[in-house]
Amino acid sequence: MAKIYTDKDVSLDVIKEKRVAVLGYGSQGRAWALNLRDSGIKVSVGLEREGNSWKQAENDGFKPLRTEEAVRNSDIIIFLLPDMIQRTVYLERVKPYLKEGMDLVFAHGFNIHYRLIEPPSNVDVYMIAPKAPGPIVREYFAKGGGVPALVATYQDHSGKALQKALAVAKAIGATRAGVIETTFKEETETDLFGEQVDLVGGVMQLMRYAFQTLVEAGYQPEVAYFETINEMKLIVDLVYEKGFSGMLTAVSDTAKYGGMTVGKMVIDESVKERMKKALDNIRSGKFAEKWVEEYGKGANTIKEGMKEVDNSTEEKVGRSLRDIILRGKPKS
């Protein structure tokens, strides 16, 4: 079983006197910087240019610095930038200023695991991967809670990399919930797999095919949207709160019987075999290699895919129904 760390297992002392630079001020960057500061950690925000993120950081009470200046004046460098720009920022803005004893910290293992970034041997390299988007990381922390996270060490020059990883996790609120120790390899491969086969790829494609099947059979698109796409949230919320057994207990016997019999017909063993192929591509590095190449050519697959989704019947129907769906939502 995995080792789970909570507040009582972790001390902030190991990073209390360290200077931390958060590179990036997007969803995760803002949440981490605010939470770290509220935990008493000395934080600076490093940004590439004076844009919207710069203004947001100033509005939040920070004095943003250019990336290289933030790096030069810090002991712990936290990469909270998009995966595909981290390597360039590292080579141009971070690597020239690295000194022995500094730390490189990541929220996802992609660049380290696939060796897009190869740190020198005299620095610590570790990861804290919150299991929620940045706004939730901040919201839960501000309300006295926290979201779970994974931690891992890749390079332990100081002998204290795990202690520091756990301390950073505590400072952003993760140990209030629970922190699981993993490896860069495990986090990267399982994260990519989940995104591809169900969370982003599989579930969206399943919902789209279900919607299209009903519409092609002559059912009203609006009704099809409610039954195959909109109600997914209700089911996922039940699974999130109560697990599969709790969800099944909550739905009707008719839904249980239909789901248990037809579900296995639609999602059969052949799907699992294709999932294994997707995992093989992740583990071998083929997916990463293909994605890096695609990004370098302008990421046209994403642009074309987004255009196709935006112009699809299901998306157009969803946009038209959003006012109805949200109108009845109680005011918080």
Swiss-Prot record:
Cofactor(s) the record lists: Mg(2+)
InterPro entries, A to Z: 6-PGluconate_DH-like_C_sf (IPR008927), KARI (IPR013023), KARI_C (IPR000506), KARI_N (IPR013116), KARI_prok (IPR014359), NAD(P)-bd_dom_sf (IPR036291)
Organism in which the protein naturally occurs: Sulfolobus acidocaldarius (strain ATCC 33909 / DSM 639 / JCM 8929 / NBRC 15157 / NCIMB 11770)
Function description: Involved in the biosynthesis of branched-chain amino acids (BCAA). Catalyzes an alkyl-migration followed by a ketol-acid reduction of (S)-2-acetolactate (S2AL) to yield (R)-2,3-dihydroxy-isovalerate. In the isomerase reaction, S2AL is rearranged via a Mg-dependent methyl migration to produce 3-hydroxy-3-methyl-2-ketobutyrate (HMKB). In the reductase reaction, this 2-ketoacid undergoes a metal-dependent reduction by NADPH to yield (R)-2,3-dihydroxy-isovalerate.
Co-factor binding comment: Binds 2 magnesium ions per subunit.
Record-stated family: Belongs to the ketol-acid reductoisomerase family.
Domain KARI C-terminal knotted: 183-328
Superkingdom of this protein's organism: Archaea
Molecular function (Gene Ontology), one example: NADP binding
Pathway note: Amino-acid biosynthesis; L-isoleucine biosynthesis; L-isoleucine from 2-oxobutanoate: step 2/4; Amino-acid biosynthesis; L-valine biosynthesis; L-valine from pyruvate: step 2/4
Enzyme class: oxidoreductase
Gene3D superfamilies cross-referenced by the UniProt entry: 6.10.240.10, NAD(P)-binding Rossmann-like Domain
Documented EC number(s): 1.1.1.86
Cited PANTHER family: KETOL-ACID REDUCTOISOMERASE, MITOCHONDRIAL
Positions with a binding annotation for NADP(+): 25-28, 53, 83-86, 134
Entry binding sites for Mg(2+) 1: 191, 195
Domain KARI N-terminal Rossmann: 2-182
Positions of substrate binding: 252
Keywords: Amino-acid biosynthesis, Branched-chain amino acid biosynthesis, Magnesium, Metal-binding, NADP, Oxidoreductase
Active site, per annotation: 108
Name recorded for this polypeptide: Ketol-acid reductoisomerase (NADP(+))
Recorded catalytic activity of this chain's protein: (2R)-2,3-dihydroxy-3-methylbutanoate + NADP(+) = (2S)-2-acetolactate + NADPH + H(+); (2R,3R)-2,3-dihydroxy-3-methylpentanoate + NADP(+) = (S)-2-ethyl-2-hydroxy-3-oxobutanoate + NADPH + H(+)
HAMAP family given in the database record: IlvC
Coiled-coil stretches: none
Residues given in the record as Mg(2+) 2 binding sites: 191, 227, 231
Gene Ontology BP term (one): isoleucine biosynthetic process
